[in-house]
C-alpha cells in the first residue's frame, strides 16, 4: 500500500511503518542523485534510474531500522517516479525471485542489483561468509556497497543485509579498509 506523507517536486517523505521501500527502475532513464534523510539527518546518497512510468524491474531498501521515523527522499532526476516508490513488508516481485529467466541457479546471486569482486571470504563459527561489491539500486556498476551472504555448504546461500554502505567519504570499493 502507498503510504506517503508528502510529495513535492523532487522530494517525497514517508513515515516508516513497513520493512522495505520499493523503487521502480527503468534503464531508459538517465541516472539521478537520490538522497535519503532520516529525521532530518543524512543517511545515504546514491544514483538511480527511477522509472517515471512502467518499471523494467524493482529494487528495494530495507528500512526496518527506521520504523516510526520519517525518511525524506530527494531526487534530481525525473521526479515522476517518486510517486511510485512505496512501502511494503515484501520486496516487489518477491514471489518470482530466483525463478527469473537466465538467473544462475548454482552460483550465488543477490536478490536485486549488480554484484562483483568477492571479498573477505572466510569460514567462521560453522558458516562460510561471502562479502562482495554490490549495487543494490540497479543491475549495472555504481553505488558500491559490500554485500554479505552466508552458507553452510557453499551451495545454499542466505543473503544478509549489506555490510558496508557508501558514506561521506565515498563508496566501498575492493581494497577499502575498515
Predicted regions and their residues:
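Carbohydrate-active catalytic/glycan-binding domains of CAZyme proteins
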Residues: 8-178
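Bacterial N-terminal signal peptides
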Residues: 1-3
Amino acid at each position: 500500500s502507498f503510504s506517503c506523507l508528502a510529495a513535492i517536486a523532487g522530494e517525497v517523505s514517508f513515515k516508516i511503518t513497513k520493512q522495505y521501500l520499493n523503487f521502480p527502475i527503468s534503464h531508459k532513464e538517465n541516472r539521478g542523485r537520490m538522497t535519503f534523510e532520516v529525521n532530518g539527518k543524512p543517511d545515504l546518497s546514491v544514483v538511480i534510474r527511477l522509472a517515471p512510468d512502467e518499471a523494467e524491474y524493482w529494487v528495494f531498501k530495507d528500512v526496518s531500522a527506521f520504523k516510526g521515523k520519517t525518511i525524506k527522499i530527494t531526487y534530481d532526476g525525473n521526479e515522476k517516479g517518486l510517486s511510485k516508490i512505496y512501502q511494503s513488508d515484501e520486496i516487489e516481485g518477491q514471489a518470482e525471485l530466483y525463478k527469473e529467466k537466465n538467473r544462475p541457479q548454482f552460483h550465488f546471486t543477490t536478490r536485486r542489483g549488480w554484484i562483483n569482486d568477492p571479498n573477505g571470504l572466510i569460514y567462521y563459527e560453522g558458516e562460510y561468509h561471502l562479502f562482495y561489491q554490490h549495487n543494490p539500486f540497479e543491475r549495472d556498476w555504481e553505488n558500491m556497497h559490500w554485500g554479505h551472504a552466508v552458507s553452510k555448504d557453499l551451495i545454499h546461500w542466505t543473503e544478509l543485509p549489506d555490510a558496508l554502505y557508501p558514506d561521506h567519504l565515498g563508496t566501498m570499493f575492493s581494497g577499502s579498509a575498515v
